[in-house]
């Protein structure tokens, strides 16, 4: 495949003379900018002193346009004036690198950027980052710093603070986030701490993607010799401590459930794995089940550790206006999500057959005989009500 970028010039020179290594380059892009620089390493046998420069002049993101799809945009100007110093054991970098007049629209990023700039100032063995990204609905501010005075103990910190950052994950999720996050990196540890507020979200699930169907918890992978394959460990441990607040304008439309969600969660990750604690409430909702439009009277999803094992405590009732004798009839779902217990209930309390009759028909069993009772009993058995299973 031919690279869809035209070059006015590409030059590269390298050599070693009198114990000194030199590398020089020039890349001149047609109708765009230049990337040029040189690096020198003196006293190769001992001190390995570093010197050189890197310059990026008038470079724009037009060079990636050939790789964009229809309707996608990538605009911005990249510039750098950098100077290299120090030695191989303690490299120093001075100068400035920046991306300005940034505008990006594309399916490969979670949000559109209407205006943005990111600048990094290098101060020898430290650097400072600042930036601001504006989106159609909000913004994201970036600050950070890095320190490599000790190469084996370098560290970098980036803080992100934003408001109404509209994140789209087509076709199912549109969500506004107000992040207040701090990301820290060290040679042997990555950390993410902070808070994410979600004031608004629209989550619509038509079909469950194949990727969302997880493997069995007792699945064992085998190699070609039919021996168990040990799970791979991440090269750098990850720690996270996040507070997630779900606001008052978050709705879910999935598998017959239309509901408003609120709640607060704590996400923790360490070498033991990912943990989730907190509660999601369903203050209002409708659920289609058993051919009925049920109203969610109580809805709680509780997390206490494992992400994939929330505890359900949900009650959905038939519309009381369409139920005879002022009876409340509904479905109660309790227990762990992978093995919930489903019960038919009524207020006042009736037999399961009578309660199911009120739930499905809005009236009690015919007093005259056993036919209706037998039919309801058969339906209860068929539905598995009162048993643990994957009914919901």
PLM segments and residue spans:
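Long beta-sheet-rich domains in secretory-pathway and surface-associated proteins
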Residues: 56-58
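Glycine- and small hydrophobic-rich membrane-insertion segments that are intrinsically disordered
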Residues: 360-392
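Strand-loop-strand
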Residues: 3-31, 77-80, 102-104, 109-371
């Amino acid at each position: 495949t031919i690279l869809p970028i035209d070059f006015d010039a590409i030059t590269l020179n390298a050599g070693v003379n009198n114990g000194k290594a030199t590398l020089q380059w020039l890349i001149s892009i047609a109708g765009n900018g230049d990337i040029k620089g040189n690096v020198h390493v003196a006293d190769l046998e001992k001190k390995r002193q570093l010197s050189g420069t890197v310059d990026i002049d008038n470079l724009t993101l037009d060079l990636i346009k050939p790789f964009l799809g229809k309707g996608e945009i990538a605009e911005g100007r990249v510039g750098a004036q950098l100077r290299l110093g120090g030695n191989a054991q303690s490299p120093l970098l001075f100068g400035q690198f920046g991306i300005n007049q940034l505008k990006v629209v594309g399916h490969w990023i979670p949000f559109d950027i209407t205006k943005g700039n990111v600048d990094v100032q290098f101060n020898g063995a430290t650097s400072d980052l600042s930036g601001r990204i504006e989106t159609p609905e909000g913004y994201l501010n970036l600050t950070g710093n890095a320190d490599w005075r000790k190469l084996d103990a370098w560290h970098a910190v980036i803080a992100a603070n934003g408001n109404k950052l509209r994140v789209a994950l087509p076709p199912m999720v549109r969500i506004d986030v107000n992040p207040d996050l701090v990301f820290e990196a060290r040679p042997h540890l990555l950390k993410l701490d902070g808070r994410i507020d979600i004031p608004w979200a629209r989550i619509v699930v038509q079909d469950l993607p194949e990727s969302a169907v997880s493997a069995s918890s007792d699945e064992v992978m085998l190699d070609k010799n039919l021996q168990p394959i040990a799970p791979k460990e991440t090269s750098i441990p990850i720690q996270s401590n996040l507070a997630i607040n779900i606001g008052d304008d978050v709705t879910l439309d999935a598998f017959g459930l239309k509901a408003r969600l609120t709640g607060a969660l704590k996400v923790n990750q360490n070498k033991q794995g990912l943990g989730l604690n907190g509660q999601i409430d369903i203050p209002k909702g409708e659920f289609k089940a058993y051919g009925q439009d049920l109203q969610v009277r109580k809805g709680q999803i509780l997390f206490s550790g494992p992400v994939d094992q929330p505890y359900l405590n949900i009650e959905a009732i038939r519309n009381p206006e369409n139920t005879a004798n002022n009876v409340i009839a509904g479905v109660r779902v309790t227990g762990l999500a992978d093995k919930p217990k489903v019960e038919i209930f009524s207020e006042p309390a009736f037999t399961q057959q009578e309660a199911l009759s009120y739930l499905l028909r809005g009236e009690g069993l015919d007093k005259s005989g056993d036919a209706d009772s037998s039919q309801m009993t058969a339906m209860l058995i068929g539905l598995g009500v009162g048993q643990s299973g994957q009914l919901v």
